[in-house]
């Protein structure tokens, strides 16, 4: 089963889908388009075969310009589920599946319309892994 994100905005619904796939002995994958990007694939290959040395830091910068329609943003799950999820996936994939040791996230909302939804429009995230890897993400809706 190949699913597009978000599978759900509720963790228990995602777990139900995973459990059903396991019970049915079916593969279950959530696809992220950056893993198909030739440049990211080349980077992953170079990291995997040691061609560019040890991964010590990942920095990513994502923008969503122009800002998506408010109708979409109301159902998107928020900036973490809509935008940052792609950066988190890249960190997990490029790091070989390392699990974060600590995470710091800060954000703000400049748009009154987005603020009314209880969401943010600018976020910075730092992640530290036990291997020493440090990652930084800066994301903004515009």
What residues fall within each predicted segment?
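Short glycine/serine/threonine-enriched helix-capping/active-site loop
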Residues: 29-32, 58-61, 105
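Alpha-helical elements of Rossmann-like donor-binding domains used by nucleotide-donor carbohydrate transfer enzymes
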Residues: 16, 42-45, 89-90, 124
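Rossmann-like dinucleotide-binding domain that binds NAD(P)(H)
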Residues: 70-142
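Short, well-ordered coil/turn segments that N-cap beta-strands
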Residues: 26-27, 54, 131-135
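Beta-strand-loop-alpha-helix segment that lines the small-molecule cofactor/substrate pocket
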Residues: 1-35, 50
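Short beta-strand and adjoining strand-loop segment in the mid-core
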Residues: 43-51, 77
């Amino acid at each position: 089963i190949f699913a597009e994100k978000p599978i759900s905005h509720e963790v228990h619904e995602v777990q139900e889908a995973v459990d059903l796939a396991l019970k049915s002995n079916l593969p279950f994958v959530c696809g992220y388009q950056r893993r198909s990007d030739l440049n990211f694939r080349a980077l992953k290959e170079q990291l995997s075969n040691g061609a560019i040395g040890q991964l010590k830091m990942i920095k990513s910068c994502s923008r969503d310009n122009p800002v998506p329609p408010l109708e979409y943003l109301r159902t998107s799950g928020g900036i973490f589920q809509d935008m940052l999820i792609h950066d988190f996936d890249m960190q997990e994939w490029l790091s070989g599946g390392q699990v974060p040791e600590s995470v710091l996230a800060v954000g703000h909302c400049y748009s009154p319309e987005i603020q009314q939804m209880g969401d943010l429009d600018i976020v910075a995230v730092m992640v530290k892994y036990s291997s020493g890897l440090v990652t930084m993400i800066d994301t903004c809706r515009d």
